[in-house]
Amino acid sequence: MTTLELAVIGSSLLENEQRLPIDPAHFEGIPPGLRRHMTFEQGYAEPFGIPDARLEQLFAGVAPRDELLATRDVVLLHKMQAADLALAREGGVLWGWPHCVQQRELTQVAIDRRQTLIAWEA
């Protein structure tokens, strides 16, 4: 069975959005077997005093936001926007708060690009 590669993105295209999908306090509680398949956005934990070098020790590594969107199987992105989905790989999975009813453009981009959206509140 193939293990999917997971991207964790902390930045948002929404103004003043600063929440993170995974609190850095929980990093070491994630099983090592899963951590090997998780790549974080560059600078993800720096506001908490955790440098990228530490994330590279704990996880598969760090990479720029656009690269993660374009290359990973599953992307944790808390407040995704239509522009994010346009950059994400076709057929990929995005997990966060898509708000499909309120964001019709986002929903249409996901349909057109055959993407799967998973809502945290579901």
PLM features: residue spans?
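A general structural motif
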Residues: 1-3, 35, 72, 90-91
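N-terminal phosphate-binding or glycine-rich loops at protein starts, especially the Walker A/P-loop
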Residues: 2-41
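Anion (oxyanion) recognition and catalysis
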Residues: 31-32, 56, 111
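Phosphate/diphosphate ligand-binding glycine-rich loop within oxidoreductases
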Residues: 73-122
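Structural motif
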Residues: 9-11, 40-44, 77-80, 97-99
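Short hydrophobic alpha-helical runs that function as membrane-insertion/retention elements
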Residues: 39-40, 63, 117-120
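N-terminal beta-loop-helix "entrance" segment that forms/cooperates
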Residues: 38-61
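Short acidic low-complexity segments
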Residues: 59-71
